Every structure is written in structure tokens, then in C-alpha cells.
């Protein structure tokens, strides 16, 4: 929804006053900034006419170089030249070191396990490096547009988790820039095409950038963009094509034990070769060694296709899974939008066309389409298009829930629910006199907490000391437009509440998401059985707890024989509950309930006698 224009009494809002806002595609390989000017949306070039800014930052003793200048020095100073920093956002140092890819950087570890780059200017984290990439883009926009920006929309991969999204917002905050919204990259592409082409129906967004792959299935209907399902791989992109080419060239030239400088030189040449093979059947690769030796080799398109075929096949497999999640077939997909520079690779376009059965859309530059969509959205959010009824409905990738007794998961917000969203559910106390309740927020599709991902823990204190089950605690999950989660617990009678904003310290890759989804399907039958067992065990514990309290208070209402029978059945329930037969536990509980019905009736009669003792009929 656009912001309203408000004027002082007696004055009118100035309809001609244009607020300055831009869209930024903070990419793994390149970044762009775009704006709406005179009704036209376009990316903004720098003084040299270059639209894209290489997402590269080099730290020297005296300065910070960003973009093309940093790229020029990357081969000579790889240790202090940070490329593809987006891949480090929200990830732990342990995760990075455990990965297959090696990096030329010297790392240190922060207190919470996140990576720090050791540079001539000290230790910097991925958020600070990202801020350095944003800095020239913001400066370029303000110089071109002629004023201070009132807000920006920054795009992120659809599979970025809360920590990665928050890191992106923090990078902008370091520069004092207001983030109007974080927008999923596929959704931004849909805006760019949807508004221009007035598309309605199901559309696939195939986004293959430098470091990430996202596939999103969207339904476009009268200005509403609803993401039906998302999938992809946050560790697969054009960078991986480059590394395969580099490995091929090293093998042909029989290069081993290469230093970081030569490795960077090879990587740069690999990218050039990849781009050349977009239009040519073959091209010559060339590097010069430190001793002046010149190495050359011919690389053909057929060879390159063979190298990357498995990776391209992985993206198609993700497309197939995501279509299944969305509940649609390829026949229902009206168009496929290509996003990201890596979609220029001929094999990628050929495979996408073969899978979806129609040529993909490429009328908007795939490198610029995301920035253009973000700019359109920024223009709306800042209030320049109050007539716009554009609505964005993104989805969350994994279900969110609360741990309940027995280690069970109570899902509050289901997977693929559109956001922003707010869902509430009521819980109660387990024991008499309970005055506090611990909450464990989890993420995942499995039935037991042990098989899900822990997000956060917090405690609600000040619950009135009532009987078990008498207190009512309302737990509300809110996921905002940026995908950030807030959980609030409130005791209804007193209004006492506690809340937490979930910002996981570690990132969650889409590979892990895919694994969690596969496991939920693979173990579905076992999980249901384990859940049924846990539920019966919890119910047995609740019944025994309640009955122990009742016997302690009113046990004198029973004679010795009656008490003995109840004690024996209670012992049997406890014994059976320790086993793994849910049906046997349920049967034992029912038998105990039947045996104690007369005791419950006596307790009720006794309570009534005590309540009315000493009162006259008139008082009653």
C-alpha cells in the first residue's frame, strides 16, 4: 500500500512533489541501482557510463576500493580483495570452513561464531563489506537524482533466512539509509514484467545469478503477486561455472600447487571465457605466469556445456520440485522469466525452454530486471504512486511453531503461508500453581522438536497461580514483509506478556531446507507414530499429576480397598506410559478414568457441602 500525502490544514498536498527512492539489486557478483524518473524505470550509470558495480571490495592500508577498481587488483591482492561477500552473509565461520570451496582470505571468528575478514584496516564482517558496496550506489543515486534519498528497496534471494535478511538491513543502517522493504529477487522480477506486460496467470521466475539459484512459482492476478512456492540453491550460480572452467584449465595446463594470485588470475580468465562462449562456438583462454610464460588453450562451447551440464540439471530438478510444491504443471505456466547474468549461458536457456516447453522471457536485461522491479516498488512505497493497488504476497519456506509437552511441535504458521502474516494460538499450563512458561520457537516440518531447527527461546513470567489448564496464554506469531519473525506470549487475564524477535545467528541454506522437506516426507509415517506415542505419554503424565494432587487433598473420601485399587491402576498407567505402545497407554488411561469416576463424584459432592456449610436457604 502506498503512503498517504498529508498536508497542514488550509494547505493542499503537492502532487508534483516527487519523493526520491531507489531499488538496489545487491548481487553476489554485480550490484545495480535503479529509479523511476518521469514515469520511466531504468538503472542508473556511474560517471563512466557503467550500470553494474562489481560486488568486490578491496581493503588497503589507506583506503577502501569498491567495484571495478577493486576488481583490477583482485589478482594481485586476493587476500584483501573480498568477492561474493553475499555468500558469507548469515553463515558461521565453521560452516564456511566445512565447505568444499577454499578462500584466500585470513579469517577470524566473532564472539557468536560469525566470520571476520582480517584486512590492513582491521577486522571487518560481511555486513560492513556489504555496506561498502551499497555506499557508491547510494552516492550515485543521490547525485543523479539531485537530492537525498527518502528510502530504498533492497532485493535478497528468496531463500535468505532471518539472519541474512537482517544483515542486509544492517548494512544499509550503517550508512543511515532507510530500508522501505527487503524484496525477494524473483518477486522484483515479477513486478518488472507484470506491470509492463499486464500478465495474469502462473509465471515461473528462473533466477540464476553469480552465487545463488532461485526458482519461484507466482500467480499474477489483477496486480496481486502471490508466490505459490519457492525453491533453489543458495550455493549454486555462475561462480560455480567459473570454478569448473578454472579446474579444467588447470588440468589442461597441468598446474598444481598454485598460489592465490594465480588462482585469481585463472578465475578472471574463466569468467571471460564463459562470457565469450555465449556467442562463440569456441574461444582461446590465455594466462601469463609469474615468470612470463604464456599459456593458451582453446575451449569449445561443447566442452563448456559438458562441464556445467550437471549443475544446470540440478536447477531443472529444483524447478520440478517447486512446481510440485505449487501444485501446478508446466502446461499451466504461461511464461518463464529469466533473471541473472548466468541465464545468458546458451545451455541454461536451452534446458529451461525444454523443461517448460516454451521460450523464456528475456525482453528485459536479465542483469537489470531485479533492480528495475525494486525501483518500481520503491516508487510505490515512498508515496509517488498512491493510485497503485499493487500487493505483494511472499511466502515463508518452512513452518514455524512452538514446542509443547513431550517434545512435540505445534505448528502455528505453516510452510508456504503468504507474508506478511499474523497467527495466534492459545496454550495453557501443565501444573497447578504454575507461574511461568518457557517457550521454544522452532522451524521445520517434522513432528518432534528434536528433528526441527531451533530458532529462539524466551520465558513468560507472572502467570497467576491457578489450577493446571486454567490459565490461558495467547501466543502470536508475526512475520513482516521482510520475512522477520516476532513471537509474543500474553496471559489473557492479567495482560502480562513477553516477546522476542527472531534473528538466528546462523544462516540456513536452501540445501538444508530441501533436506528438511525430504526428511519430513521420508519419515512422515514414523513421525506420526512417534507423535501419537508422545501425546499419550503427556496425557498419562497429566492425568497422574492431577490424580496425585486430588488424592493428597481428598484421599480420606476413599476406603482402604478403593484406594488400593486406584493406586494399582495408577502404577499400571505409569508402567505402560514408559513403554512405546500408544494404544496400550490410551487404554490404561481410560481404565483409570473409569475407576476414578466415583471418586470424582464424591469430591464434587464434598466441595458443594463445604461451600454451602453454615449458609441458610435464604442466603443461597
UniProtKB/Swiss-Prot annotation:
Assigned keywords, A-Z: ATP-binding, Chaperone, Nucleotide-binding
The protein, known as: Chaperone protein HscA homolog
Stored Gene3D superfamilies: 1.20.1270.10, 3.30.420.40, Actin, Chain A, domain 4 (3.90.640.10), Substrate Binding Domain Of DNAk, Chain A, domain 1 (2.60.34.10)
Gene: hscA
Matches recorded under Pfam families: HSP70
Nucleotide-binding recorded as keyword: yes
The protein's role, per its UniProt record: Chaperone involved in the maturation of iron-sulfur cluster-containing proteins. Has a low intrinsic ATPase activity which is markedly stimulated by HscB.
NCBIfam families xrefs: HscA (TIGR01991), PRK05183.1 (NF003520)
Amino acid at each position: 500500500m502506498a503512503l498517504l500525502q498529508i498536508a497542514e490544514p488550509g494547505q493542499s498536498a503537492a502532487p508534483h512533489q516527487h519523493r526520491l527512492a531507489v531499488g538496489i539489486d545487491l548481487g553476489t557478483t554485480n550490484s545495480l541501482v535503479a529509479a523511476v524518473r518521469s514515469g520511466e524505470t531504468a538503472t542508473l550509470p556511474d560517471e563512466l557510463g557503467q550500470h553494474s558495480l562489481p560486488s568486490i571490495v578491496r581493503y588497503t592500508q589507506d583506503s577502501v576500493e569498491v567495484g571495478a577498481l577493486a576488481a583490477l587488483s583482485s589478482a594481485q591482492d586476493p587476500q584483501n580483495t573480498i568477492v561474493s561477500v553475499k555468500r558469507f552473509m548469515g553463515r558461521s565461520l565453521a560452516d564456511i570452513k566445512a565447505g568444499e570451496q577454499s578462500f584466500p582470505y585470513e579469517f577470524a571468528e566473532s564472539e557468536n561464531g560469525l566470520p571476520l575478514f582480517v584486512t590492513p584496516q582491521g577486522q571487518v564482517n560481511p555486513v560492513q563489506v556489504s555496506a561498502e558496496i551499497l555506499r557508491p550506489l547510494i552516492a550515485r543515486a543521490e547525485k543523479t537524482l539531485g537530492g537525498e534519498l527518502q528510502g530504498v528497496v533492497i532485493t535478497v534471494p528468496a531463500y535468505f533466512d532471518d539472519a541474512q535478511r537482517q544483515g542486509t538491513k544492517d548494512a544499509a543502517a550503517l550508512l543511515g539509509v532507510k530500508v522501505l522493504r527487503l524484496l525477494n529477487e524473483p518477486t522484483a522480477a515479477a513486478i518488472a514484467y507484470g506491470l509492463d506486460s499486464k500478465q495474469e496467470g502462473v509465471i515461473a521466475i528462473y533466477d540464476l545469478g553469480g552465487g545463488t539459484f532461485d526458482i519461484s512459482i507466482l500467480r499474477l492476478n489483477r496486480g496481486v503477486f502471490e508466490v505459490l512456492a519457492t525453491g533453489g540453491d543458495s550455493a549454486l550460480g555462475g561462480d560455480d561455472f567459473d570454478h569448473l572452467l578454472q579446474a579444467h584449465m588447470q588440468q589442461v595446463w597441468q598446474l598444481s600447487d598454485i598460489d592465490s594470485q594465480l588462482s585469481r588470475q585463472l578465475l578472471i580468465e574463466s569468467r571471460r571465457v564463459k562470457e565469450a562462449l555465449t556467442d562463440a562456438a569456441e574461444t582461446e583462454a590465455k594466462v601469463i605466469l609469474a615468470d612470463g610464460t604464456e599459456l593458451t588453450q582453446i575451449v569449445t562451447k561443447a566442452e563448456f556445456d559438458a562441464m556445467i551440464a550437471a549443475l544446470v540439471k540440478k536447477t531443472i530438478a529444483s524447478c520440478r520440485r517447486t512446481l510440485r510444491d505449487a501444485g501446478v504443471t508446466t502446461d499451466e505456466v504461461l511464461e518463464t522469466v529469466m533473471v541473472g547474468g548466468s541465464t545468458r549461458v546458451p545451455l541454461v536457456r536451452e534446458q529451461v525452454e525444454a523443461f517448460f516447453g516454451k521460450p523464456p522471457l528475456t525482453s528485459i536485461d536479465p542483469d537489470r530486471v531485479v533492480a528495475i522491479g525494486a525501483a518500481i516498488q520503491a516508487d510505490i512505497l515512498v508515496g509517488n504512486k498512491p493510485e497503485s493497488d499493487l500487493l505483494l504476497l511472499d511466502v515463508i519456506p518452512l513452518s514455524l511453531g512452538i514446542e509443547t509437552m513431550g517434545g512435540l511441535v505445534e505448528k502455528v504458521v505453516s510452510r508456504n503461508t503468504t507474508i506478511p502474516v499474523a497467527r495466534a494460538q492459545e496454550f495453557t499450563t501443565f501444573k497447578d500453581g504454575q507461574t511461568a512458561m518457557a517457550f521454544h520457537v522452532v522451524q521445520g516440518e517434522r513432528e518432534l522438536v528434536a528433528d526441527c531447527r531451533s530458532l529462539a527461546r524466551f520465558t513468560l513470567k507472572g502467570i497467576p497461580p491457578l489450577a493446571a489448564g486454567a490459565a490461558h496464554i495467547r501466543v502470536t506469531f508475526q512475520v513482516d514483509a521482510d520475512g522477520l519473525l516476532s513471537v509474543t506470549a500474553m496471559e489473557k487475564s492479567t495482560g502480562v506478556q513477553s516477546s522476542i524477535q527472531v534473528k538466528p545467528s546462523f544462516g540456513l541454506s536452501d540445501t538444508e531446507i530441501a533436506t528438511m522437506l525430504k526428511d519430513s516426507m521420508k519419515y512422515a509415517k514414523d513421525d506420526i507414530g512417534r507423535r501419537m506415542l508422545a501425546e499419550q505419554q503427556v496425557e498419562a503424565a497429566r492425568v497422574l499429576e492431577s490424580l496425585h494432587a486430588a488424592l493428597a487433598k481428598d484421599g480420606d473420601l476413599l476406603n482402604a480397598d478403593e484406594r488400593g485399587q486406584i493406586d494399582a491402576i495408577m502404577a499400571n498407567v505409569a508402567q505402560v506410559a514408559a513403554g512405546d505402545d500408544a494404544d496400550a497407554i490410551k487404554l490404561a488411561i481410560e481404565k483409570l478414568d473409569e475407576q476414578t469416576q466415583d471418586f470424582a463424584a464424591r469430591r464434587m459432592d464434598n466441595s458443594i457441602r463445604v461451600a454451602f456449610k453454615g449458609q441458610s436457604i435464604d442466603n443461597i
